[in-house]
């Protein structure tokens, strides 16, 4: 078994909506990013890549490459997952924590879980997504951006 951890943060800027966990969420602010700014899928992709010792999302999909300008993070997650499976790994489970004062994530979490399970080809019971605030402390509490942490457990697939 191998464990990976991922973290991502994006500042608010411009106009919404935002995309978190593959879900388009209405909000008056957007997120500043080279790709679609999906902090949840970026953190999750990093956790999976880390568990497989494949580096990180910036190595695989550099923000200096115009190919990835405005990229759909679900596509990036699926490509990373293909590479991980090619190394002989299967998914144990993933756990994602979104850290944001606003907008409220709770109504969108069920669809996030559906999208992540689809992209990883796993059962929804293997995917957990939760959200928390920082009680108005720090940059997320001041409404300056959104952060996310994720962990992933990979299992070496039997041959």
Swiss-Prot record:
PROSITE patterns for the chain: ISPF
GO molecular function, one term: metal ion binding
Enzyme class (EC, first level): lyase
Keywords, in A-Z order: Isoprene biosynthesis, Lyase, Metal-binding
A Gene Ontology biological process term: isopentenyl diphosphate biosynthetic process, methylerythritol 4-phosphate pathway
Signal sequence bounds: none
Protein name, entry field: 2-C-methyl-D-erythritol 2,4-cyclodiphosphate synthase
Organism from which the protein derives: Escherichia coli O1:K1 / APEC
């Amino acid at each position: 078994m191998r464990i990976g951890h991922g973290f991502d943060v994006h500042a608010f800027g411009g106009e919404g909506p935002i995309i978190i966990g593959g879900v388009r969420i209405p909000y008056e602010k957007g997120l500043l990013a080279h790709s679609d700014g999906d902090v949840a899928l970026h953190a999750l992709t990093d956790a999976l890549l880390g568990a497989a010792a494949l580096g990180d999302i910036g190595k695989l999909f550099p923000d200096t490459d115009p190919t990835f300008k405005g990229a759909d993070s679900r596509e990036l997650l699926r490509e990373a997952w293909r590479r991980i499976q090619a190394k002989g790994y299967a998914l144990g489970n993933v756990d994602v924590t979104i850290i944001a004062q606003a907008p409220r994530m709770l109504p969108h979490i069920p669809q996030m879980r559906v999208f992540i399970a689809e992209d990883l080809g796993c059962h929804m019971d293997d995917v957990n997504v939760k959200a928390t605030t920082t009680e108005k402390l720090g940059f997320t509490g001041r409404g300056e951006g959104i952060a996310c942490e994720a962990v992933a457990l990979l299992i070496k697939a039997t041959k």
